[in-house]
């Protein structure tokens, strides 16, 4: 029989202990410490903590919004599926509109990606929500355009789009001017659905 740890909770405990031993968390505020640990856990790279950028009080803002029942708006199904429902404090709605029937036609009409124009369906849910971008840079660019045009403001933006075209730029644009919305990003090309969902899961409950 192969010798390996079979207890899921023991694996989590050892993983988080290893992260805290190896990662430099000195610059992470208390309200984002668990978020940083879970983002590292999701990608396996302790150095990603060096690329985390955030506005003051972002973690507290996200926790308060979720506790108050805020909707969680996700740019991709993989992000939405990664949110652990049992951790959510108020049976929060997890919304992804990418597969709405009119999105392909809307993308053609507006001359943008489906990931971007799917945010048109977010308008009624945006105010006070937690926005989670874990895939498409165009979705984050489009969100900023919507806010510039007067769309309601979410309570928090978790900006984790990934890739080689627009990912770094969209996140830097958010950090440079968050339109008055608290935010957390990982700078550069790194990001993705697993890290984005991990950030939500960390804010959803005080449980490790």
Swiss-Prot record:
Catalytic residues identified in the record: 41
GO biological process, one term: cobalamin biosynthetic process
Chain's role: Catalyzes the conversion of precorrin-8X to hydrogenobyrinate.
Key words, A-Z: Cobalamin biosynthesis, Isomerase
EC number(s) reported in the record: 5.4.99.61
Binding site for substrate: 15, 38
Reaction(s) catalysed by this chain's protein: precorrin-8X + 3 H(+) = hydrogenobyrinate
Secretion signal span: none
Gene Ontology molecular function: any one: precorrin-8X methylmutase activity
This protein's record includes keyword Isomerase: yes
PANTHER family: COBALT-PRECORRIN-8 METHYLMUTASE (PTHR43588:SF1)
Pathway: Cofactor biosynthesis; adenosylcobalamin biosynthesis; cob(II)yrinate a,c-diamide from precorrin-2 (aerobic route): step 8/10
Name of the protein: Precorrin-8X methylmutase
Record-stated family: Belongs to the CobH/CbiC family.
A Pfam family recorded for this sequence: CbiC
Known partners and oligomeric status: Homodimer.
Protein source organism: Pseudomonas aeruginosa (strain ATCC 15692 / DSM 22644 / CIP 104116 / JCM 14847 / LMG 12228 / 1C / PRS 101 / PAO1)
């Amino acid at each position: 029989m192969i010798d390996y740890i079979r207890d899921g909770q023991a694996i989590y405990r050892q993983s988080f202990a290893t992260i805290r031993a190896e990662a430099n968390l000195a610059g992470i505020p208390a309200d984002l410490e668990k978020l940083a640990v879970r983002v590292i856990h999701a990608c396996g790279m302790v150095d990603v903590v060096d690329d985390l950028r955030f506005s003051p009080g972002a973690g507290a803002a996200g926790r308060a919004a979720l506790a108050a029942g805020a909707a969680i708006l996700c740019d991709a199904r993989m992000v939405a599926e990664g949110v652990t429902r049992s951790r959510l404090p108020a049976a929060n709605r997890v919304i992804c509109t990418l597969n709405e029937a009119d999105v392909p036609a809307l993308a053609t009409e507006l001359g943008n990606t489906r990931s971007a124009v799917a945010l048109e369906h977010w308008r009624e849910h945006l105010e006070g929500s937690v926005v989670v971008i874990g895939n498409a840079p165009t979705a984050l660019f489009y969100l900023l355009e919507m806010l510039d045009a007067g769309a309601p403001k979410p309570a928090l933006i978790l900006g984790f789009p990934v890739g080689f075209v627009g990912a770094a730029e969209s996140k830097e644009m958010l950090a440079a001017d968050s339109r008055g919305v608290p935010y957390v990003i990982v700078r550069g090309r790194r990001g993705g659905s697993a890290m984005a969902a991990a950030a939500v899961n960390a804010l959803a409950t005080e449980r490790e």
